[in-house]
Amino acid sequence: MSKVSDLYDVTWEDMRDKMKTWREENYRNSEHVIEVGEELINEHASKLGDDIWIIYEQVMIAALDCGRDDIAMSCLQELRRQFPGSHRVKRLTGLRFEAMERYDDALQIYDRILQDDPTNTAARKRKIAIRKAQGRNAEAIRELNEYLEQFVGDQEAWHELAELYINELDYAKAAFCLEELILTNPHNHFYYQQFAEVKYTQGGLENLELSRKYFSQALKLNNHNMRALFGLYISSVHIASNPKASAKMKKDNVKYATWATSQIKKAYQLAGRTMTDTQTSLKAVEDMLETLQITQS
């Protein structure tokens, strides 16, 4: 099999730096990680210094993704030899058991880690991940809430809890979690968009108004957010057609829907769609808008 360095005319330093970039950007390209990482380990181990251990870990996790337990076990054995008793290496053992669906064995490992170090957040999160993998969402929710009582600033955990509540159709609690995220991340357009989607799903005129406002804010923060743009359109449409909405509210929301339609058209055109494709894609949108305008006239 040809070497990466020969195929792409790169040095071992280039490959090392590429592995670092992939780690830092959480780039999920497991097959490439294995290919590059194995060559670094097999051909350049003596040059890597302490970097070799993080590369072993990186290759192991990628191997689990690809179902290559032989590679994962080889990396794990090297890490165990270098770091006997390490909680981090024990957690990797737990990850391997998870990949094999040996959840009870994985839980035992995480429990032992937590006995030694009750503040080990990685082990607690893996236990929650196992509950989710087993479809035990109620337990995952309970454990996440307990976790957040101690680590209230963990944004990843708040978002995971919001997703679990959404899966359980508990939209009020999901909205609360997303509000917490917005408070700590006021410039993250995705959280505004997701909060808007939850309020839209809850329904009712008040929630629809909130939904439209938060879709609008998501667009202000990122005017390329097409999901928020469509959300602005559809929430405006539903407000304008709501019998409880005032005449002014209906008129304003027809205007918002009209603006959103024009922006969607522009986005399609900028993306290189032909006029025919654009018109076809937007036909249903425009038909609904026309119906609204007739209703308001």
From Swiss-Prot:
GO cellular component: cytoplasm; EMC complex; endoplasmic reticulum; endoplasmic reticulum membrane; extrinsic component of endoplasmic reticulum membrane
Gene Ontology biological process terms in this record: protein insertion into ER membrane by stop-transfer membrane-anchor sequence; tail-anchored membrane protein insertion into ER membrane
Compartments in which it is found: Endoplasmic reticulum membrane
Keyword Zinc found: no
UniProt entry tagged with the keyword Repeat: yes
Highest taxon in the source lineage: Eukaryota
TPR repeats (start-end): 87-120, 155-188, 192-225
Any single Pfam family the record assigns to this protein: TPR_EMC2
Membrane topology designation: Peripheral membrane protein
Gene3D superfamilies in the cross-refs: Tetratricopeptide repeat domain
Keywords, in A-Z order: Endoplasmic reticulum, Membrane, Repeat, TPR repeat
Major subcellular location class: endoplasmic reticulum
Family that this chain belongs to: Belongs to the EMC2 family.
Role of this protein: Part of the endoplasmic reticulum membrane protein complex (EMC) that enables the energy-independent insertion into endoplasmic reticulum membranes of newly synthesized membrane proteins. Preferentially accommodates proteins with transmembrane domains that are weakly hydrophobic or contain destabilizing features such as charged and aromatic residues. Involved in the cotranslational insertion of multi-pass membrane proteins in which stop-transfer membrane-anchor sequences become ER membrane spanning helices.
Subunit structure: Component of the ER membrane protein complex (EMC).
PANTHER family listed in its UniProt record: TETRATRICOPEPTIDE REPEAT PROTEIN
Name of the protein this chain belongs to: ER membrane protein complex subunit 2
Organism: Xenopus tropicalis (Western clawed frog)
